[in-house]
């Protein structure tokens, strides 16, 4: 009997820990998987252009699920990769990207912003039209 209670307690703990990670609806999880695949395709082009091995992720916890179901996140996120490609248009830029940029994280925010620390570029944006690529490019050119 005690063994069953321990198993139940462990199972309940596992479910409680796993729920936040899997709290998104099936529709949202499918959309996220598709958008991550789209971002991965774009990342292949960026890495080919730059001769780099940058990794990219979308921090889904920072986006409103209903809003991200209506408006694709990937095109906004791709602005950061476009900015990196622009910087790679010459050898100095390629070398700098390869030496310094290791990851790109796209996150939701009220206003667009870029930050860079320890090889990690974080690009935050809302899902409304704006000049994301320009913001990231200007930021990287001044910060790298």
Predicted regions and their residues:
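Boundary at the C-terminal end of the N-terminal hydrophobic targeting segment
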Residues: 20-23
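Active-site recognition of the HExxH zinc-binding catalytic motif
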Residues: 130-144
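Short N-terminal segments immediately surrounding and downstream of signal-peptide cleavage
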Residues: 25-42
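Auxiliary, metal-adjacent structural segments of Zn-dependent hydrolase domains
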Residues: 62-129
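Bacterial N-terminal signal peptides
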Residues: 9-18
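Bacterial N-terminal signal peptides that target proteins for export
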Residues: 1-9
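Extracellular distal adhesion/interaction modules in secreted or cell-surface proteins
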Residues: 42-65, 118, 128, 140
């Amino acid at each position: 009997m005690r063994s069953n209670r321990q198993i139940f307690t462990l199972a309940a703990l596992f479910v409680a820990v796993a729920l936040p990670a899997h709290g998104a609806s099936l529709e949202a999880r499918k959309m996220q998987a598709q958008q991550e695949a789209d971002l991965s395709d774009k990342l292949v082009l960026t890495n080919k252009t730059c001769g780099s091995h940058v990794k990219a992720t979308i921090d889904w916890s920072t986006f409103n699920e209903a809003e991200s179901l209506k408006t694709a996140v990937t095109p906004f996120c791709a602005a950061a990769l476009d900015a990196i490609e622009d910087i790679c248009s010459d050898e100095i830029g390629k070398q700098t990207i390869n030496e310094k940029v290791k990851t790109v994280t796209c996150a939701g925010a009220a206003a667009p912003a870029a930050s860079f620390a320890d090889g990690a570029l974080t690009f935050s944006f809302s899902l409304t039209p704006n000049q994301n690529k320009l913001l990231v490019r200007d930021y990287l050119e001044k910060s790298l």
